[in-house]
């Protein structure tokens, strides 16, 4: 929040910021656009679309309306893992957010760790009405927990004729919501034993969970291939972090990372429609907060040069 406040304080005297106003659509032609909101219409010669991952569907509609080409992209499906912080402490004490990538022997798929949160909490996330799982940690030592959490994600890239990778991820997340009323949680030991984690088994875990979730069976939600990949990855991680494959390791599901179809933009992040820019994670070009932020700065500099 402090970072956002600092940004707001810096720009508030230089630009107009509209709060509580939703953009409905963009119409127009090259260097002549109308941005339509639920309250007003704004005219401009340059329009920047940066709606994030959650706005990927809307960005696709904008691109289709303007005839801007898109390429099919991927969706990442997996779980949020929660373990005692001591298991990964020898890694997180040196690399706060380690990025570990593993290619499975069974399928040759890539599985990666993502969003490492030492001494953090598992949380829920609402994306277009679908409840998925995420995680965070606090800068304040007083708010630390005894656990570390991170995502294990399997990347899925589809070929013809299937094009809607986001719909694939949404369907899996909706199934989890249907079975558990939200987020499901399962002990790793129960998963590999082929049994559901019920309230009794969940109550026997030595780990103190940081999220209230519904004990269940992730094998009824996540497709076999992705689940096999995740299990293999956990055993691989156990070799560098003993205790990872413990029976009480908690797996929360599902975690889904949506990516927009990669929008056809040039080196300046400008589409074939002159004056219309698409950037950030919603463009399918960037895949992180830092990259998305950098793309915004880059586009702003590019546009400002037009007026110099």
Segments and roles (model prediction):
Residues 1-308:
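Residues forming the flavin
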């Amino acid at each position: 929040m402090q970072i956002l406040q600092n940004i707001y304080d810096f720009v508030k005297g230089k630009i107009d910021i509209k709060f509580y106003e939703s953009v409905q659509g963009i119409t127009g032609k090259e260097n002549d656009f109308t941005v339509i909101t639920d309250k007003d219409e704004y005219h401009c010669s340059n329009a920047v679309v940066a709606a994030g991952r959650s706005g990927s569907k809307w960005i696709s509609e904008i691109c289709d309306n303007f005839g801007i080409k898109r390429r099919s992209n991927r969706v990442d499906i997996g779980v949020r893992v929660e373990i005692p912080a001591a298991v990964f402490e020898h890694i997180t004490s040196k690399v706060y957010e380690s990025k570990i990538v593993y290619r499975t022997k069974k399928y040759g798929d890539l599985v990666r760790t993502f969003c490492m949160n030492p001494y953090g909490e598992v949380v829920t996330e609402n994306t277009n009405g679908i409840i998925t799982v995420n995680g965070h940690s606090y800068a304040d030592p007083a708010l630390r927990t005894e656990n570390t959490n991170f995502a294990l994600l399997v990347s899925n890239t589809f070929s013809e004729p299937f094009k809607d990778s986001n719909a694939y991820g949404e369907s899996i997340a909706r199934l989890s919501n249907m079975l558990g009323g939200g987020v499901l949680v399962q002990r790793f030991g129960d998963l590999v034993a082929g049994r559901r984690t019920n309230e009794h088994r969940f109550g026997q875990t030595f780990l103190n969970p940081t999220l209230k979730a519904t004990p269940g069976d992730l094998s009824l939600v996540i497709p076999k291939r992705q689940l096999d990949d995740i299990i293999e990855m956990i055993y691989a991680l156990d070799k560098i972090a003993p205790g990872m494959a413990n029976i009480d390791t908690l797996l929360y599901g599902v975690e889904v990372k949506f990516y927009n179809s990669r929008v056809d933009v040039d080196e300046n992040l400008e589409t074939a429609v002159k004056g219309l820019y698409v950037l950030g994670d919603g463009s399918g070009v960037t895949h992180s907060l830092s990259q998305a932020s950098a793309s915004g700065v880059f586009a702003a500099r590019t546009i400002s040069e037009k007026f110099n």
